[in-house]
């Protein structure tokens, strides 16, 4: 394996822990088998020696991704190159086995192999290394042995089985692969040399009891084996040559899933090395072969314009320029292959519509004659939308091409359908194309099957169903005469409804309907009633399949349909007042136009319908009279008894077709609205993420925006800063943690206060950051602010712009957004970067880095950025679309700021930005880093990126990708380096360098001769260097750019007005910080961060549980579950009794919120009985027609009556995770939630128990029994909560965090492991068998989930092709994993522990 390839592969990562638990016996910690289906594995753990020995005999394991170099075999040996060679090797292996080995195999395979009597000779290579290799193997064997084996020779001859074990287990523990190809080859040779050779062993074993004469006779008869050494040597030399020529590839070492995860598949490499922007390749992968014609390109521009224009709200006279701008942007994307940042930065003039008008201010002689006004046609979001619509249009054209091909094939069979020919060019949506496709399959199904049969596509020639047969019999029989008698075709009826052309009125048949039906009787339909029934069915199907009729329905529904929700029986009890879906439970009569302005509401409706909680109804309002309108279009103009009967017949056939059309159109409309609403919420998420990214580093007063500050950060985590240690970290500008430590109580301990003062004065930070994940952090914030003021701790000096004097201000204490730090503190990245720091200190480090550059911290999260909260309903969005939208926001911001390419080579945090640079992506970013490293590890100029043969520089990127990324990768200007170009440190694209140089020359007032002389002597960048050296950049402001821009457009057809302005700005301030100032959190944001509550989840009128802390004569201080304090006045407790008679310290009671001060984390509460009797009702302002108040009241009464009948007193626990569910309901509720989500619910075991249900994986839920102890009242939560008689917690939050969430992290760690298979146990065993069949000389193992026993996984392993698959239960526990009674903290320890355990067992068996 080459070094370059090895660098692409990281070692086994230490992933976050995530585990699950099970229910235990309360006294002994043993599993309760009576409830095993729900909470335990039911797997008996038998430690019997014979059982273990049997399992060991069935096979041992070596990772399938480890090289099989032992035994002289390489991957080349595994392949069946020559049958003779394989037989030769097989005989060698058999010859190495002694009697004990054969007995062992015989027990496993059911028979004993025949002994081998023939031996082969092999040439030894590098024999001098035998001794060393033997020592290595002996060391591994002796790990498990107390005795020292002194006789190496004896071990070689008489203990061959131990060699066999060493071969198999040599690389059993996961190790890195050699970096050096020579080292890899050396190891292969070592393995061959170290293997005990059968010829030596065989000779000694077979001739030990023979005397010399006998040996001479045997040699005379059979020879000594040397006669044919030359042939064997030639054969082995040929094998060696083939082995050397066949290089090891990544796919020989890693599984496809691993290569895919690491972006190292052949497809990834193709993307990596293709000279096209990576994001374009991925987006257009499906339509790689689709080439748009010039006419289709124009059509696409019109199609996208029509999609975007209605939402822009621009003046009507800008519609034509808007369409041209869209067309030009498409040209940039498709023809020039440049990405959004490039277009926005370097083609900005094409996104504007400029007007040149005569200056109205003619009185001012110095005023210009003309003024320029500009209208912004497209913004950056529009460019991303155009790119998205381009993919949709390609999908549309691809489907239309397939449809046209089908029509052409039918025309080849002399089938012409004018309606299809007319409607295909008119179609503008995928739905309309699908309607046409459905119509073709309905109308010409048999012909299409014949075409498919001719083409050999047997999948389309399956036997038609009974419905198709019926319709075909009607179509080909006499009954179709009745269909014609309806007077007009289904398509013509649709035309009438759509008002297309002149209305055609149906003619009534000369006979009455029944008489006509009787006349059409045949062998298929033997009665008139059958004829009428079949004809109705046929015509209704024709109406249902009519593309025009569907279009009429669809248009009408979009225009006038109203949407209502109806709760199901399941949703009646599930959706209670606190349920997130309550706001849609009784929603009714909502116009589509209104719902699209509340996208969250409709997404909740669709999700609730998927969960079976509600049904969504789309109805045409009665005032619209939609069905009656259709009746009228189908009526004849005749008046008679016969005409009336035909009118009734037509009405019946419409009534038959209407529900079918209504159902399919309603489904289609709902999906279209869902997609629209998803796009709207995705847009909101993107905007919110962009807002967080659009923050420059924190700027202390007097510093230039963009300067990185030195930060001191403190945090108390979840603890009380008055009682528990406060962690702090000091982080320099470059992100290094220089110093860290702990402090005590800063409010009262003077010694600690002085220590803090000394720290600040010694380190002189630019700012103090603070954060935490509890409401107690507010105390720390107040303590720090008080300390700064009391001790006079000042920030850095800065120049006062008013007085020009230097002064200082008190050091600012900033509460920092900690959403990134919370993910970082326990991540594998944090553990790798700061293994010696505790989680809270690592949290402080992340907070400091966030203040130094928020964008880099978000980029470092990678895929985890999707787990942050941007919108309350983001869980209702497709995960892949959300990730793509978030990535687009990062792309915008990274390219706005640019990336110092040389800094990226030395700093991983900066390198994390490279995938978001225009033209690049995760694959190309790694390629860029490796190529630059190959070129010496640094970039001198932007031109070097496309290669420089003269200086031996290899190309880093291709020309097209370079064109995309060049201006966004900057190189700091070095005045002392003559080859350094100042423009390489700007946002100016190399294609515009000549413009920049000309502007510099004009600013310096140099003529052409001066410019030529300067450039001839010092190179093309000399003029700009001179401008910088003379510090004359401000002179570019004196240039009149308008005339120059007009000249460029007139002479070269280049629109560069905005580009010239960019060049002017960059010459004055290269890559100036354009992000907004660091955003300080608002009071409500701080409240949410510290408490987890929002103004919607904790507000006035809510009834919450509170814990009484202090009781005075006229008030009480209480604490809410979220951690904030509350005050209850005496008159808000009771009018009749003293407050001390009602309340006592430590008591838990219910209280109603009267007012909340979100800034001070204080609430005013009432405990009066009359106030508590009025429940909180979420405000719903939908009007009487928009909410079904009658059904709501009836449902509440029904539930009350049911509770009275059952006599059930529902227990209520005031906790955000508590739900009044049973186990099944909890599983249904958690079904749509992410893994690890928790529901606390009443227990069927009584009021001294609670049940906790959490989602282990999709369809797998664990139910945990929690015993409550030290309960104050029957319904109060116990002060001690015990799980399984083994784990004890003091409150529900601790139980969730330390028990359930800890297990969830372990489960996630296991499921993200390379060895995890997202399959059932049976499928995993099949996979192992298939893998071993393909790799017969390997052993392997895998993990899979045990769906029958939540919280358990199977460790399945297979030692060889003939061995059975053995499965061992692995249990997730809060501290790690448990296997066979042993606990392991993480997956690496679990895997290695498993291997060591079975290696040990096998070694012991070998010794016996």
Curated annotation (Swiss-Prot):
Pfam families in alphabetical order: HHH_7 (PF14635), HHH_9 (PF17674), HTH_44 (PF14641), SH2_2 (PF14633), SPT6_acidic (PF14632), Spt6_S1 (PF21710), Tex_central_region (PF22706), YqgF (PF14639)
GO biological process, one term: transcription elongation-coupled chromatin remodeling
PROSITE patterns, sorted: S1
Span of domain SH2: 1213-1314
Start and end residues of each S1 motif domain: 1101-1168
Cellular compartments annotated: Nucleus; Chromosome
Lineage per the UniProt record: Eukaryota, Fungi, Dikarya, Ascomycota, Pezizomycotina
Function: Histone H3-H4 chaperone that plays a role in maintenance of chromatin structure during RNA polymerase II transcription elongation thereby repressing transcription initiation from cryptic promoters. Mediates the reassembly of nucleosomes onto the promoters of at least a selected set of genes during repression; the nucleosome reassembly is essential for transcriptional repression. Essential for viability.
Keywords of this entry: Chromosome, Nucleus, SH2 domain, Transcription
GO CC annotation: transcription elongation factor complex
Nucleus is among the record's keywords: yes
Biased composition (Acidic residues): 13-24, 39-51, 61-75, 95-104, 168-184
SUPFAM superfamilies membership: Nucleic acid-binding proteins (SSF50249), Ribonuclease H-like (SSF53098), RuvA domain 2-like (SSF47781), SH2 domain (SSF55550), Tex N-terminal region-like (SSF158832)
Domain of life the protein comes from: Eukaryota
Family stated for the protein in its record: Belongs to the SPT6 family.
Region (Disordered): 1-199
The protein's name: Transcription elongation factor SPT6
Composition skew (Basic and acidic residues), residue ranges: 127-141, 185-199
GO MF annotations, alphabetized: DNA binding; histone binding; nucleosome binding
């Amino acid at each position: 394996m080459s070094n370059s390839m090895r660098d692409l592969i990281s070692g086994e990562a230490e992933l976050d822990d995530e585990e699950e638990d099970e229910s235990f016996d309360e006294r002994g910690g043993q599993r309760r088998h009576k409830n095993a289906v729900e909470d335990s594995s039911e797997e008996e753990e038998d430690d019997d020696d014979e059982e273990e020995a049997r399992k060991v005999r069935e096979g041992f394991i070596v990772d399938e991704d480890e090289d099989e170099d032992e035994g002289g075999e390489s991957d080349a040996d595994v392949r069946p190159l020559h049958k003779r060679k394989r037989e030769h090797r097989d005989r060698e292996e058999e010859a190495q086995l002694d009697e004990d080995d054969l007995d062992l195999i015989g027990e496993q395979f059911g028979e004993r192999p025949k002994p081998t009597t023939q031996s082969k000779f092999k040439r030894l290579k590098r024999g001098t290394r035998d001794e060393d290799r033997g020592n290595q193997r002996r060391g591994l064997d002796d790990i498990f042995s107390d005795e020292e084996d002194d006789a190496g020779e004896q071990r070689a001859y008489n203990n061959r089985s131990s060699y066999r074990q060493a071969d198999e287990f040599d690389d059993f523990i996961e190790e890195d692969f050699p970096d050096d190809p020579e080292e890899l080859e050396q190891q292969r040779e070592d393995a061959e040399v170290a293997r005990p050779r059968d010829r030596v062993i065989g000779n000694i074993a077979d001739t030990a009891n023979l005397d010399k004469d006998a040996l001479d006779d045997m040699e005379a008869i059979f020879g000594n084996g040397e006669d044919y050494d030359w042939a064997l040597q030639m054969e082995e030399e040929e094998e060696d040559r083939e082995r050397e020529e066949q290089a090891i590839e990544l796919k020989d070492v890693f599984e496809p899933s691993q290569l895919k995860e690491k972006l190292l598949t052949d497809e990834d490499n193709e993307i990596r090395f293709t000279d096209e922007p990576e994001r374009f390749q991925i987006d257009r992968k499906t339509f790689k072969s689709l080439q748009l014609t010039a006419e289709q390109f124009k059509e696409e521009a019109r199609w996208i314009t029509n999609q975007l224009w209605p939402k822009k709200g621009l003046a009507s006279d800008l519609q034509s320029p808007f369409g041209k701008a869209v067309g030009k942007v498409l040209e940039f994307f498709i023809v020039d292959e440049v990405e959004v940042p490039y277009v926005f930065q370097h083609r900005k003039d094409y996104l504007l519509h400029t007007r040149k008008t005569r200056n109205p201010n003619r009185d001012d002689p110095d005023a210009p004659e003309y003024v320029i006004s500009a209208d912004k046609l497209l913004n950056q979001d529009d460019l991303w939308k155009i790119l998205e619509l381009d993919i949709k249009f390609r999908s549309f054209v691809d489907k239309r091409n397939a449809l046209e091909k089908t029509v052409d094939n039918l025309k080849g069979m002399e089938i012409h359908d004018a309606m299809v020919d007319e409607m295909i060019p008119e179609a503008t949506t995928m739905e309309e194309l699908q309607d046409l496709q459905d119509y073709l399959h309905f109308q010409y199904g048999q012909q299409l099957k014949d075409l498919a049969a001719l083409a050999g596509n047997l999948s389309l020639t399956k036997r038609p169903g009974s419905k198709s047969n019926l319709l075909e019999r009607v179509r080909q029989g006499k009954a179709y005469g009745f269909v014609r008698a309806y007077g007009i075709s289904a398509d013509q009826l649709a035309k009438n409804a759509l008002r297309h052309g002149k209305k055609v009125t149906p003619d009534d048949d000369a006979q009455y309907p029944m008489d006509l039906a009787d006349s059409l009787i045949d062998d298929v339909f033997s009665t008139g009633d059958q004829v009428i029934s079949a004809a109705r069915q046929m015509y209704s199907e024709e109406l249902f399949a009519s593309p025009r009729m569907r279009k009429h329905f669809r248009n009408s529904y979009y225009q006038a349909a109203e949407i209502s929700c109806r709760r199901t029986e399941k949703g009646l009890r599930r959706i209670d007042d606190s349920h997130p879906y309550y706001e849609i439970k009784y929603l009714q009569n909502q116009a589509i136009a209104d719902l699209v302005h509340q996208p969250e509401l409709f997404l909740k409706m669709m999700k609730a319908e998927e969960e079976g909680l509600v049904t969504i109804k789309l109805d045409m309002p009665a005032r619209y009279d939609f069905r009656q309108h259709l009746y009228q279009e189908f009526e004849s103009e005749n008046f008679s008894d016969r005409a009336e009967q035909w009118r009734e017949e037509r009405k019946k056939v419409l009534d038959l077709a209407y529900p079918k059309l209504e159902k399919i159109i309603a489904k289609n409309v709902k999906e279209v609205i869902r997609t629209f609403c998803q796009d709207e919420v995705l847009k909101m998420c993107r905007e919110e993420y962009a807002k967080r990214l659009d923050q420059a580093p924190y700027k202390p007063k007097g510093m230039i925006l963009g300067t990185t500050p030195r930060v001191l950060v403190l945090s108390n985590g979840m603890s009380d800063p008055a009682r528990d240690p406060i962690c702090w970290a000091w982080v320099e500008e470059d992100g290094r943690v220089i110093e860290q430590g702990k402090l005590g109580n800063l409010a009262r301990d003077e010694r600690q206060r002085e220590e803090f003062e000394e720290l600040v004065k010694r380190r002189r930070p630019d700012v103090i950051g603070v954060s935490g994940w509890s409401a107690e952090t507010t105390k720390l914030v107040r303590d720090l602010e008080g300390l700064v003021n009391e001790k006079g701790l000042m920030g850095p000096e800065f120049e006062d712009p008013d007085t020009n004097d230097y002064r200082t201000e008190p050091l600012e204490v900033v509460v920092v957004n900690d959403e990134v730090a919370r993910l970082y503190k326990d991540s594998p990245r944090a553990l790798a970067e700061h293994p010696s720091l505790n989680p809270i200190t690592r949290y402080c480090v992340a907070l400091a880095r966030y203040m130094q550059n928020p964008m880099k911290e978000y980029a470092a999260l990678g895929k985890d950025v999707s787990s942050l909260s941007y919108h309350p309903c983001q869980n209702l969005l497709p995960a892949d679309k959300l990730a793509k939208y978030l990535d687009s926001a990062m792309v915008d911001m990274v390219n706005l700021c640019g990336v110092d390419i040389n800094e990226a080579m030395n700093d991983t945090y900066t390198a994390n930005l490279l995938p978001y640079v225009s033209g690049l992506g995760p694959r190309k970013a790694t390629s860029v880093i490796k190529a630059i490293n190959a070129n010496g590890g640094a970039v001198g100029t932007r031109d070097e990126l496309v290669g420089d043969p003269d200086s031996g520089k290899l190309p880093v990127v291709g020309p097209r990708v370079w064109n995309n990324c060049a201006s966004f990768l900057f190189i700091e200007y070095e005045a002392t380096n003559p080859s350094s170009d100042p423009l390489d440190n700007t946002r100016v694209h190399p294609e515009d360098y000549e413009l920049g140089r000309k502007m510099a020359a004009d600013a310096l007032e140099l003529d052409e001769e001066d410019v030529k002389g300067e450039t001839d002597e010092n190179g093309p960048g000399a003029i700009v260097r001179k401008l910088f050296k003379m510090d004359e950049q401000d002179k570019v402001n004196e240039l009149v750019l308008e005339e120059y821009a007009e000249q460029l457009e007139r002479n070269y057809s280049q629109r560069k007005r905005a580009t010239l302005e960019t060049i002017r700005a960059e010459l004055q301030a290269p890559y100036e910080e354009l992000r907004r100032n660091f955003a300080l959190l608002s009071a409500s944001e701080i409240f949410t961060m510290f408490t987890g509550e929002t103004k919607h989840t904790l507000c006035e009128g809510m009834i919450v549980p509170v814990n009484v802390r202090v009781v005075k004569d006229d008030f009480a201080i209480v604490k809410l579950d979220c951690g904030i304090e509350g005050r209850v006045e005496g008159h808000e407790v009771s009018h009749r009794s003293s407050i001390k008679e009602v309340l006592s310290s430590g008591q838990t009671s219910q209280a109603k919120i009267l007012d909340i001060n979100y800034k001070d984390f204080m609430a005013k509460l009432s405990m009066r009985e009359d106030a508590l009797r009025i429940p909180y009702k979420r405000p719903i302002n939908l009007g009487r027609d928009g909410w079904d108040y009658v059904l709501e009241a009836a449902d509440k009464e029904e539930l009350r009556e049911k509770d009275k009948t059952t006599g059930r007193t529902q227990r209520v626990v005031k906790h955000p995770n508590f739900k009044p569910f049973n186990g099944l309901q909890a599983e249904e509720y958690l079904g749509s939630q992410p893994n690890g989500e928790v529901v606390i619910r009443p227990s069927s075991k009584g009021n001294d128990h609670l049940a906790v249900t959490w989602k282990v994986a999709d369809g797998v839920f664990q139910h945990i029994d929690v015993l409550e102890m030290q309960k104050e009242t029957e319904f109060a939560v116990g002060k001690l909560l015990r799980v399984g008689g083994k784990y004890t917690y003091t409150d529900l939050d601790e139980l969730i965090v330390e028990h359930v969430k800890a297990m969830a992290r372990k489960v996630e760690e296991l499921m993200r492991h390379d060895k995890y298979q997202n399959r059932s146990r049976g499928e995993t065993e099949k996979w192992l068998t298939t893998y071993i069949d393909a790799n017969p000389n390997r052993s392997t193992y895998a993990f899979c989930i045990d769906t029958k026993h939540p919280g358990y996984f199977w460790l399945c392993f297979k030692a060889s092709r003939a061995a059975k698959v053995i499965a061992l239960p692995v249990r997730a526990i809060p501290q790690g994993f448990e296997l066979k009674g042993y606990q392991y903290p993480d997956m690496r320890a679990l895997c290695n522990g498993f291997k060591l355990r079975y290696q040990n067992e096998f070694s012991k068996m070998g010794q016996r």
